[in-house]
Structure formats: C-alpha cells, structure tokens
Amino acid sequence: MVKLTQRLGGLVLRFAAFCAALGAVIAMITSRERSSFFVISLVAKYSDLAAFKYFVIANAIVTVYSFLVLFLPKESLLWKFVVVLDLMVTMLLTSSLSAAVAVAQVGKRGNANAGWLPICGQVPRFCDQITGALIAGLVALVLYVFLLIFSIHHVVDPFLLRKS
C-alpha cells in the first residue's frame, strides 16, 4: 500500500509539473501585443528576446520529458537514471526562469543607467501574459524540486534500509 501511495504521489507531482510547464509554454508563445503612438508602432512578442526563447525551449523540453516519464513502468531500471534527469531538468528550469525573469524585470522597470525605458506601460497585456508564463514556470520549478527530493528518496531509501 505504501509503494502504491508513493507511486501515485510521484505521478500526481509529475502530471502537475507537466501541466505547469505546458501552461508556461502556451502562455509565453501566445504573448503578443501591438501598440501605436502617433506614427510609431510597437509590436511586442516573446520571440524578440533570446531569454524568452530559451524559456520556451526549456519548458518544452521539460513538458516532453514529464510526459514520457509518466508512462515509464514502475519496474523499469531507468528510474535510477530518472533521478539524474530530474536534477538536470530542475537546473534547466532554474536557469531559464532566471534569465526570463531578468529580462521581464528590465521590460517592466527599465534600466536608467543603460538608458533602457520600460515597455509595460505601452504593452500591458503582453507584460501580464509574460508574468503569467513566468508564474507557471515557477510552479513547474517548485514541483520539480519536490520531484527531485522524492526521486532521491525513492532511489536511495532501499540502500539505507538494507541490512549488511
């Protein structure tokens, strides 16, 4: 019964992480807004910024990985390798979220020292959608941290309980 509960808990966490990463990808990809000021037209889209592209690619990789691991049989020897992959995915999510948040912060507040003006006043819907994508990415990251702890415990625990 305990093994079934552990397996089910891991699957629920993985499915939630899959949904969060997929939501982050969808929210980021669909973020686009056009704004005009007299004769000047501004089009804001995620693909204009490398950090946002990286965020989309990283979360897409996490989405595919999460989906594939959901169907991994519980008897498979690959579960020991899943711990390593979970660690890599957690690091990938951390780096992509950090880069995207840094760029979003500059977009929201600007940088007076560099002479960069904030754009969220001109394209608020775009900025709100980016914020939603970043929140979904943060949720995916937190879930993957829990999954990493869960995976380490699941793989290492039998070795700790073994009698010598």
Swiss-Prot record:
Keywords associated with the record: Cell membrane, Membrane, Transmembrane, Transmembrane helix
Localization in the cell: Cell membrane
Coiled coil spans: none
Cross-referenced Pfam families: CASP_dom
Keyword Oxidoreductase included in the entry's annotation: no
Cellular component terms (Gene Ontology): plasma membrane
TM region(s), chain numbering: 9-29, 52-72, 81-101, 130-150
Topological domains annotated Cytoplasmic: 1-8, 73-80, 151-164
Keyword Cytoplasm: no
Ranges facing Extracellular side: 30-51, 102-129
Assembly mode: Homodimer and heterodimers.
NCBIfam families linked: A_tha_TIGR01569
Name this protein carries in UniProt: CASP-like protein 1C2
